[in-house]
Amino acid sequence: STGTTTKTETKSEESSKGGEVAEVTGDIPTKDQVNAMSSKQIVENIKVGWNLGNSLDSHDTNSSDTETGWGNPKTTQQMIDTVKAAGFNAVRIPVTWGEHMAADGTIDAAWMSRVKEVVDYAYNDGLYVILNVHHDDELWLVPTKDKLESDKATLTTIWKQICATFQDYDHRLIFEGMNETRVIGSAEEWTGGTQESYDVINQLFQAFVDTVRASGGSNTDRTVIVTDYAQSAEKNAIGGMIVPKDDHIIVSLHIYAPWNFCGPDDTRADWGSDSDKQELDTTFQYLDDTFISKGIPVIIDETGCVNKNENTSARVAWFSYYLSAAKKHGIKCFIWDNNETKNGFGLLNRKDCTWYYPEIIQAIQDATK
């Protein structure tokens, strides 16, 4: 970290007793300090992040309250406090906007107010916060040439309003333009995309960056996040990406690897062979060679592995290796958590603010100290 920071009181507990997790506290930069940081320094200061999944990103819920429409309780300050105490110093808040907009693109005031309230839970806790446009690709955003101009207009309309709402927040608040943008249902949806989709996504991200920069306040040099087709680690997708020329930028990818272990679609429940480890090492080295060695910081702002018949020891081994191997390259990670424990990514019990698998949280702490 840079300069002096405000030290918070440190309190530690035995993590092995009664399923408790050791409480972790750390340094919170002042506004002047964080606003003077480069995007690389901000990534250096992030230890590990947590995703508020299946909450403000919910949609098509047939519910008057989309936040709880996918089965999670309303987000509370206590939830974010619990995340902070467990050693996460960054929170990603996925938000889907498309169902909360008038025909002219105006975002519903009550929705924006609620998003701001949840951002404040994390921001006022001294955490780094990522705010994004999440499942809008399932509502209106399709990266094809035919839709480029209309989608660019919608995307910039959303970001103008987000920028106006948050322009006075310091640089612990980070904007991520889009999430896993892809042509849903196409043959290339998860295989890296096409040249047409690369061209469109590159233009959309450039429009996002331009919109943020033009919006004034702290947004003129706020760190922003861009990515490739589907936020994919496929080499063709990464090769098709044009990173906007900007001094305050991060590249983010989503890497649940290997998917047959991490994802819910396969029965593979074990992990830890030499070839398993080599696969991760090779991926992280590729990201280092492609971006980091050229001065572009990288985060993986979604990763994790699901519970498969309580394969907790394999998951502990995976988290330990994955996070420490990424850290060697300066890559910081955000764990996906949807509060789903049966074949899901749930770690935090959002009803009582306890951790379902304290040993996984301990492994995350140990790997990211």
Describe the role of every protein-language-model region.
Residues 30, 71-90, 101, 105-135, ...:
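An active-site-proximal structural segment forming one wall of the substrate-binding cleft
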Residues 24, 153-269, 273-276, 285-305, ...:
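Active-site region of glycoside hydrolase catalytic domains
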Residues 277-357, 362-365:
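Substrate-binding cleft of secreted/luminal carbohydrate-active enzymes
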Residues 54-58, 90, 96-101, 135-139, ...:
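Solvent-exposed loop/turn segments at secondary-structure junctions
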Residues 12-90:
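N-terminal carbohydrate-binding accessory modules
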Residues 1-16, 333:
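Gram-positive cell-envelope targeting signals
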Residues 52-75, 102-107, 146-147, 260-280, ...:
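Acidic/histidine-rich helix-loop elements
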